[in-house]
Amino acid sequence: MFSVASFFAGVGGIDLGFEETGEFKTVYANEFDSYASETFEMNYPTVKVDQRDIHLVPVEDVPKTDVIIGGFPCQAFSIAGYRQGFEDKKGRGELFFELMRMVEANKPRVALFENVKNLVGHDNGNTFRVICEQLDLLGYHYTYQVLNAMNYGNMAQNRERIYIVAFKDEEDLNKFHWPLSIPLTTT
């Protein structure tokens, strides 16, 4: 069983996908929003959510895990927002670097990041370049793809998101395959 630390955990949607495989168990979650945290704890009764702002979480407080997952806030990169990126006046753009702080300290075998599909093209590709450079600096090998929720899990929702999967070991990356789509049978 692979252990998971979940950041920007929300209500646990990404965790659910991992746990439903039967191979992963979320052992730590960090979520600042109290309502989302409460729902997460109802969905995962064995996990007490760390509700501190990620800036205030010492890396020593996060257990060493095999996997780190994080759907870092997307408002700074979304075409629906002001697209201020890392310069977002509310500080949401730089939260990716807090996630990288956790990856650097924890050194998980695998990290998965989720965000809006516009992340790749934001600021003429500079934002995504910075993200890739951070992963390179930490010695991770990665792949990414834009997936639409309605093609995975029989969900009648047109929701395109980018997923970045990073592996500490390049052999693990070479063994990785993106999931096959599932025909939509519900509308």
Locations of regions flagged by a protein language model:
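Extreme N-terminal starter segment of soluble prokaryotic enzymes
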Residues: 1-4
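Class I SAM-dependent methyltransferase "Motif I" SAM/SAH-binding loop
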Residues: 7-12
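A short, Lys/Arg-enriched amphipathic alpha-helix followed by its capping loop at the start of a domain
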Residues: 17-25, 43
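The conserved SAM/SAH-binding core of class I Rossmann-like methyltransferase domains
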Residues: 30
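Conserved SAM/SAH-binding beta-strand->alpha-helix loop
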Residues: 33-34
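Conserved SAM-binding loop
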Residues: 40
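Conserved SAM-binding strand-loop segment of SAM-dependent methyltransferases
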Residues: 46-53
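Class I S-adenosyl-L-methionine
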Residues: 57-65, 75-187
